Amino acid sequence: MLDKLGSNINNALSKIKNATFVDKKLVKEVIKDIQKALIQADVNVKLVFAMSKEIERKAIYESAPKGLSKKDHIIKIVYDELVKLLGEEGQKLELDPKNKNIILLVGIQGSGKTTSAAKLARTLQKRGFKPALIAADVYRPAAYQQLKQLSEKIHIPLHGDPTKTKTPMEITEEGLKQFKKNDVIIIDTAGRHKEESGLLEEMKEMKEKFNPEEIILVIDGTLGQQAKNQAKAFKDAVENIGSILITKMDGSAKGGGALSAVAEIGAPIKFIGTGEKVDDLEPFDPKKFISRLLGMGDLDSLLEKTEDIIDDDTEESLDAMMRGKFTLNELYSQLEAISKMGSMKQLMAMIPGMGTNLPKGAADITEHKLKKYKIIMDSMTSTEKENPDIIKTSRMKRIAKGAGVKQEEIKELLKYYSTTKNAFQNMKSGKMLKMGGPMGKIMRQLMYKE
C-alpha cells in the first residue's frame, strides 16, 4: 500500500535527519533505500534510476540556499524529484457552470468506473454544480443497480434502463433529454471491454454522437506501471479533451507505479480514488500527494474537509478537549466526525508530521467498528462515559447485554479509547495545536473532534 511506500521513503530520509554529518556515502545509501522503495511500488526502473541520478547530483554538488541546512536541502531535493516523477503540476477539471457539460466515463471492466461515476457526481455536487447520472453500462449485470443505490445515497438523479432492452446510445439520448436543467451529465459508459481496442472504439462512437466536454479514462491503480499502455492509447485517441482517474489508491501497493507511468506519457491525471466511500475521490495534485506521502501534510485539503462541519456541538467538545478533557463523550464526537469526513488515516495524513508518526492503532478503525463502538457507548451511562476507568467486569456485562455485543468488543473499544487519548495528549503539546486564528481552530478541531 502507499502508506508502506511513504514509510519506506521516510525511513530512508530519517538517516539524513538523524545523522551528525552528511557525506557522499550517506547520500548514496539513502538513494539506494529510496530506489528500493519505489521499485517495490512498481515504479518503472528506468524512471527510478534517472531520478536517483538527479538526486545524487544535486545533493552532493549543489550548495544549500541561505537559511536552509544541508539536511533540509537534501530532503527538499527528494521532494522536488518525487513531484517531477508524478507530473509536477496538478490539473483541474474545468467546467462551465453556464452551460451543459457532458462527461463520458470510460474504463476497462473491473476498473471501478461505476463507483467513480457516483464519486465524481458527488465531488461536483459539492462544488455547486447540479449533476445527473446516466447508466449506459448495460453489459455488467449489476451496473445499473449499483449506480442507482449510490445515486440515491447522494441525492443525484439517475437515468437508466433496468430492463436492459435498450442500447447505450438510446439510454444516453433519453437521459440527455431528461436532464435539460442539469449543468453536468456524467455518463457511465458500457464497460464490457477487456482490451483497449474495444473500449476506444466505443468511446469514439460516443464522442462523435454526443460531443462531450470531457472524457475521463478510469484506470485501476493495482495495474502499476502497466497502466501506461491504457493511458497512452487513450491520450492518442482523444487528443486534448481527455483526462485520467486512477482508482484503488488506498489499497494498492502499485499505486505509485500507476501514477508515475501515466505521468510519464503526459496524460493529465485529474482525480484519484482514495477509498470505498462516495466522498473518497480527490483532485490529484502531485505536490500535495508527495507532501502527504512524506508526512508533510496537506493543509489546503484539510481546510476543505473541515469547512462544513464546524458547529456548536463541535465547538463545545473542542473546548473540553483543549482543557485536557478526553472522555468517551469526546471519542463519540470524534467517531461521528470520521463518518462524515472519511477515514482517520486519511485525515491524519493531511496534518504535517502526523501521516507517518501516528501511534499504531490510533487510526485503525473501520466503518463497521465505528458503528459498533457508537452502539456500545449508547448503552453506557453518563457516568461511565465521563469516567471510563470505572468500567469493570460487572458493568461490562450490563453494557454488552444492552448493546448486543461480546465483552471482548467493549474491551477493544476501551483499548481504542486509551490509544486515541494518548495520541491526543502527545499531539496536544505540538505546534499545530498552538496555532491561533481560524487555521489553529480548524486544525485542533480536525485532529480531535467532530
UniProtKB/Swiss-Prot annotation:
GO annotation (BP), single: SRP-dependent cotranslational protein targeting to membrane
Binding annotation for GTP: 107-114, 188-192, 247-250
GO cellular component labels: signal recognition particle
Classification via SMART domains: AAA (SM00382), SRP54 (SM00962), SRP54_N (SM00963)
Keyword Cell membrane part of the UniProt annotation: no
Any Pfam family: SRP_SPB
CDD domains named among the record's database cross-references: SRP54_G
The protein, known as: Signal recognition particle 54 kDa protein
Annotated source species: Methanococcus aeolicus (strain ATCC BAA-1280 / DSM 17508 / OCM 812 / Nankai-3)
Biological classification of the source: Archaea, Methanobacteriati, Methanobacteriota, Methanomada group, Methanococci
Gene: srp54
